[in-house]
């Protein structure tokens, strides 16, 4: 039987937490239930492949594998380099950078505000830069922003020249140049390149526009941090999660959350369980489904994008958060699996990394239940 159409076909059911398996406890120690991988899954081989610095995946810092709600394998290696202190070895308590996986966390925050009745997906958003009468950007909806079909001109290019600069890249200028103090304003100031809704354009600027909308609702700076802690990271026990805000008080949701690998796995488990955590429905299950339904094909690499998440058409319902240098949280409902991989993989090796993730998912999906 061929896989269901990822755009229109039925979504596979999301598994519940198995009876007798406790939810991960709160606190910096992680306090995850642990278990063994199923018979026939050679996890040591798969982890060796990921952690071979001379192999196609390059530098892997952390891998955490959660099966049926239990950590069944994890591995840490390498050192984090910093300009102001000696390199530090990576371990279970090391906060690592999400890069664009933060976009998927923004999806959760928007879902909370939609459920609260404070945001409407289908009404034009209130963005100050678009408030002038007749501005065609004023018709852009939150739904179009989440799908990255807003039509705004934004160049997402991380290549640097010999002077470590890229003067044609909007994302470099936003994160590290003229836009760094107010990322939402920088991105919202971009002109239209296409009518809203017409085509897909992957854009970190789009995510930061959405984050600016959230900041105006919940309050910038510390109130925003508290909202993230009280409504998302705190309830799932992700004590290490640290979102970074810019000088304007906007969470740079395109790129910046530091957390341990196990705490990133908590976020994946929240989505695998349909927004439910330890007896509480934190996010509506219907909102989780908006992360699982493909809406666009990324013309740069053929991947399927939903709403700030990525969808794999493998017949297993797999969807994922992905970030620069190969960060990923892979969620597979059919295998009841969360796979976290963090590291520093150059973009020309992304196909090999996606292939490795697919091998891990397939190994668990094919294992006897």
Model-derived features: positions:
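N-terminal leader/targeting segments and the immediately adjacent pre-domain N-terminus
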Residues: 1-88, 114-119, 151, 177, ...
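Active-site Gly/Thr loop motif
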Residues: 238-245, 288-338
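Active-site helix/loop module of the DD-peptidase/beta-lactamase fold
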Residues: 92, 97, 115-157, 189, ...
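Structured C-terminal helix/loop/strand segments within mature extracytoplasmic catalytic/sensor domains
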Residues: 2-6, 318, 323-369
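Short, charged, amphipathic alpha-helices and their helix-cap/turn boundaries
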Residues: 45, 49, 72-75, 85, ...
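A short, polar/charged loop-to-alpha-helix boundary motif
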Residues: 80-100, 349-357
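Active-site SXXK
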Residues: 69, 92-122, 145, 210-214, ...
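Active-site-proximal alpha-helical segments within enzyme catalytic domains
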Residues: 205-214, 255-276, 327-343
């Amino acid at each position: 039987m061929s896989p269901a159409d990822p755009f229109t076909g039925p979504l596979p059911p999301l598994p519940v937490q198995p009876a007798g398996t406790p939810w991960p406890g709160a606190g910096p120690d992680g306090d995850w239930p642990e278990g063994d991988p199923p018979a026939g899954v050679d996890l040591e081989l798969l982890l060796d492949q990921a952690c071979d610095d001379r192999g196609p995946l390059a530098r892997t810092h952390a891998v955490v594998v959660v099966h049926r709600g239990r950590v069944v394998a994890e591995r840490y290696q390498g050192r984090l380099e910093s300009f102001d202190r000696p390199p530090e070895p990576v371990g279970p308590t090391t906060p690592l950078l999400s890069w664009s996986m933060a976009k998927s966390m923004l999806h959760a925050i928007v879902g909370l505000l939609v459920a609260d009745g404070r945001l409407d997906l289908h009404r034009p958003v209130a963005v100050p830069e678009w408030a002038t009468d007749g501005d065609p950007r004023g018709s852009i909806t939150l739904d179009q922003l989440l799908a990255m079909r807003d039509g705004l001109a934004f160049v997402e290019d991380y290549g640097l020249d010999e002077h470590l600069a890229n003067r044609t890249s909007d994302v470099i200028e936003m994160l590290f140049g003229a836009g760094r103090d107010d990322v939402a304003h920088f991105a919202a100031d971009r002109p239209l390149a296409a009518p809203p809704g017409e085509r897909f354009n992957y854009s970190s600027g789009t995510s930061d526009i959405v984050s600016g909308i959230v900041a105006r609702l919940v309050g910038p700076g510390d109130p925003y941090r508290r909202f993230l802690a009280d409504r998302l990271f705190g309830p799932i026990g992700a004590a290490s999660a640290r979102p970074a805000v810019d000088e304007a008080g906007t969470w740079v949701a395109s790129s910046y959350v530091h957390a341990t690998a196990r705490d990133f796995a908590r976020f994946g488990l929240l989505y695998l369980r349909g927004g439910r955590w330890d007896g509480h429905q934190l996010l509506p299950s219907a909102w989780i489904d908006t992360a699982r339904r493909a809406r666009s094909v990324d013309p740069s690499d053929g991947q399927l994008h939903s709403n700030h998440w990525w969808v794999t058409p493998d017949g297993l319902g797999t969807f994922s958060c992905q970030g620069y240098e190969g960060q990923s949280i892979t969620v597979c409902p059919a295998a009841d699996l969360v796979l976290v991989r963090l590291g520093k993989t150059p973009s020309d090796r992304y196909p090999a990394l996606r292939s490795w993730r697919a091998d891990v998912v397939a190994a668990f999906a094919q294992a006897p239940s």
